Every structure is written in C-alpha cells, then in structure tokens.
UniProtKB/Swiss-Prot annotation:
Originating species: Chloroherpeton thalassium (strain ATCC 35110 / GB-78)
NCBIfam families according to UniProt: QueF-II (TIGR03139)
Enzyme class: oxidoreductase
Listed GO CC annotations: cytoplasm
Known function: Catalyzes the NADPH-dependent reduction of 7-cyano-7-deazaguanine (preQ0) to 7-aminomethyl-7-deazaguanine (preQ1).
HAMAP family, alphabetized: QueF_type1 (MF_00818)
Main localization (coarse): cytoplasm
Gene3D superfamilies from the UniProt entry: 3.30.1130.10
Name of protein: NADPH-dependent 7-cyano-7-deazaguanine reductase
Keyword Cytoplasm: yes
EC number: 1.7.1.13
Length: 116
C-alpha cells in the first residue's frame, strides 16, 4: 500500500461543515490466512478542513490492496490512518462491509475526530 499515491486539492469552503461520502463497491484484498480474495465495499465519510481527497488518486490507492494479504480490521484502520494523514479532516469515518465468507459477513467501522 502506497499512501503517497493520495493527492489532495484545496477545500473552497473550509468554514462550512459538510460531509463528503465516497463509496467503492468493488474493493478487493487477499485473506492472509487462506490466500483467497476478499470482496468488500469501502465507504469513506468525512468533513473536510482545508483539503479534500482527489478521487482518481484514491482509486489507485485502493487498487494497491488488491494483492495484499491483510485482515479486514487492518484494511479499515490502515485506510483511515493514511487518509487522515493526507487530508487532515475535521472528522472521518471508514466503513468496510465484506461479502460473506463461510456464511458470515463482517462490517468494520473506524472513526477519527480532530481535536478542537
């Protein structure tokens, strides 16, 4: 995973709190136990401060996970950490919803809130 792929642009309305929601319904990674592919939906919700994430760079960042052996919980927290570092939002939440494996589905949510 390469967080340096993430690009940003200036938020034109930094004094207004508004929520940006970006959904990737085609996220893939690899189960580190079985080596089988994991399929999920990643939802990014954030209130920007001075910067917003650029979508094409986010897409390529997500593609870095395609061949990575990584647990769901680690995917979710890694994405949150990398995006918080790049965007420095007021608030951010990552929700990862994973397709059923052995009849069990998993949803992982990780959140960040800047100190006021």
């Amino acid at each position: 995973m390469k967080p340096e792929l993430l690009e940003t642009f200036e938020n034109q309305y930094p004094n207004r709190d508004y929520t940006i929601e970006i959904v990737n319904p085609e996220f893939t990674s690899v189960c580190p136990k079985t080596g089988l592919p994991d399929f999920g939906t990643i939802t990014l919700q954030y209130i920007p401060n001075k910067l917003c994430v650029e979508l094409k760079s986010l897409k390529y960042y997500y593609l870095e996970f395609r061949n990575a052996g990584i647990f769901y919980e680690n995917v979710t927290n890694k994405i949150l950490d990398d995006l918080v570092k790049a965007v420095k939002p007021k608030e951010m939440k990552i929700i990862s919803e994973w397709k059923a494996r052995g009849g069990i589905t998993t949803t992982v949510t990780a959140s960040y809130e800047a100190e006021k």
